[in-house]
Regions:
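Small-residue-enriched hydrophobic alpha-helices in membranes
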Residues: 1-26, 32-125
C-alpha cells in the first residue's frame, strides 16, 4: 500500500490540505509555476484524493489552510520527498525553493540536511 494512502489519520482532510499547501508554496517559491510543476502537483494531490479545483482554492487562499503535523517520521519524510520532487521536476533548482523546503522540513521536525541528501540522491539517478 502506498504510504500516502496511510499518511492521514482522523484529520486526514487537514493533513491533505496542509501538504498540498506546502507543495503549492514550493512550486511558487521561484516566482513562477512551470507546466511540469503544475502537472506533478496535480498528480500528487490526486493521489491524496484532491481535485484541481481544491488545489486552486489552496493556491488562491493559502492562509486559510492550517499546518497539520503528520503523525510519524516516515510520513514527514514522505512529504519532504514530495516537496523535493516538485522542486526538481523542472531541472531548475532555485535557492528560494531550497530554503523554503528546508524551513518546511524544520516545521515537520526533520533535520533540513535531508533536503540536500534527497537532492543529491535524485541527481545521481
Amino acid at each position: 500500500m502506498d504510504i500516502l494512502s496511510n499518511i492521514f489519520g482522523p484529520d486526514k482532510e487537514g493533513l491533505r490540505r496542509s501538504h498540498v499547501k506546502n507543495l503549492v508554496s514550493i512550486a511558487l517559491a521561484d516566482g513562477h509555476l512551470s507546466e511540469d510543476e503544475w502537472e506533478l502537483l496535480v498528480y500528487l494531490a490526486s493521489r491524496l484524493g484532491m481535485e484541481e479545483e481544491e488545489i486552486n482554492a489552496i493556491r488562491e487562499n493559502p492562509e486559510a489552510v492550517k499546518f497539520v503535523m503528520p503523525k510519524t517520521h516516515d510520513q514527514r519524510v514522505q512529504q519532504i520527498e514530495d516537496l523535493v520532487l516538485l522542486m526538481t521536476i523542472d531541472h531548475d533548482i532555485n535557492p528560494n525553493e531550497v530554503e523554503l523546503c528546508k524551513k518546511i522540513s524544520l516545521k515537520l521536525d526533520v533535520l533540513p540536511q535531508i533536503v540536500d541528501d534527497i537532492i543529491t540522491g535524485r541527481s545521481q539517478e
